[in-house]
């Protein structure tokens, strides 16, 4: 079972190979042209936050891949990414936005559960590497799309961003319906399969990438301080493949931004 303290810590953080689609994949619609004259004016702080939150949700909801439900990389018109590229980390952010939308009544809970269920069904059959996801997938097939020349395998930071959303979805969808039950069971299966301690190479530090073609050639150890802190939190909380405390102490917390053993705030 998931550790309650671990989940609470996660919520406090700042911040196929499978069946082909039975019908042609829809091409994404071009983003609408915005007219500055139609922008809302004189918003209160609350209204502005509501607007930002709703528009964030709309990107992930309206522009999700039609087969997988996953979040697209930018608008897919930038840098010639192509229409099928979806991103794991961005999908984790999108899952959180979908939960918010359901809670605020912008969509029904059933609609939210159906979309999240589609996403976990896709991930359940997609390419994985020692339980970790790649940065990019083909949203129709579940095959890995390389992010860079040697980055065509596991990306444990993007995997972590994905699990921030997946684990929160598992805690949110608690009702006895087919979609909500599917989310809980498959997220647990996926989560328990990530071999976090394997990504240390037997050392006291986590490594960002691994590729079946290129091995550890990216050679990118994760040292703090940056957005990858969540990777160490998740790796420490793994029910099956947890890292030792020394991996955090000697890997993450040795970065130049840590003032270990020194007083820097005395009130």
Regions from the PLM with identified roles:
Residues 1-3:
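N-terminal secretory signal peptides that target proteins for export/translocation
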Residues 5-15:
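Bacterial N-terminal signal peptides
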Residues 20-267:
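Ser/Thr/Asn(+Pro)-rich, low-complexity disordered segments
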């Amino acid at each position: 079972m998931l550790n309650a303290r671990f989940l609470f810590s996660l919520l406090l953080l700042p911040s196929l190979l499978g069946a082909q689609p039975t019908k042609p994949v829809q091409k994404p619609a071009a983003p609408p042209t915005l007219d500055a004259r139609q922008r809302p004016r004189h918003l209160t702080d609350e209204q502005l936050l509501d607007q930002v939150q709703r528009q964030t949700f709309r990107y992930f909801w309206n522009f999700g891949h039609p087969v997988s439900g996953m979040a697209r990389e930018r608008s897919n018109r930038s840098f010639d990414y192509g229409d099928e590229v979806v991103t794991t980390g961005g999908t984790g952010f999108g899952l959180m936005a979908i939960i918010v939308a359901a809670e605020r009544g912008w969509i029904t809970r059933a609609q939210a559960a159906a979309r999240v269920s589609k996403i976990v069904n896709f991930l359940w059959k997609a390419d994985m590497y020692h339980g970790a996801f790649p940065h990019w997938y083909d949203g129709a097939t579940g095959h890995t799309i390389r992010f860079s020349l040697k980055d065509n395998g596991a990306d444990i930071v993007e995997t972590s961003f994905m699990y921030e959303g997946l684990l929160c979805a598992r805690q949110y969808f608690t009702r006895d319906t087919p979609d909500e039950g599917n989310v809980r069971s498959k997220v647990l299966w996926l989560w328990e399969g990530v071999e976090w301690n394997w990504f240390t190479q037997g050392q006291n530090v986590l490594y960002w990438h691994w590729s079946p073609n290129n091995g550890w050639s990216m050679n990118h150890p994760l040292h703090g301080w940056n957005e990858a802190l969540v990777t160490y939190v998740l790796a420490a909380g793994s029910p099956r493949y947890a890292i030792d405390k020394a991996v955090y102490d000697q890997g993450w917390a040795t970065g130049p931004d840590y003032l270990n053993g020194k007083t820097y705030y005395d009130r």
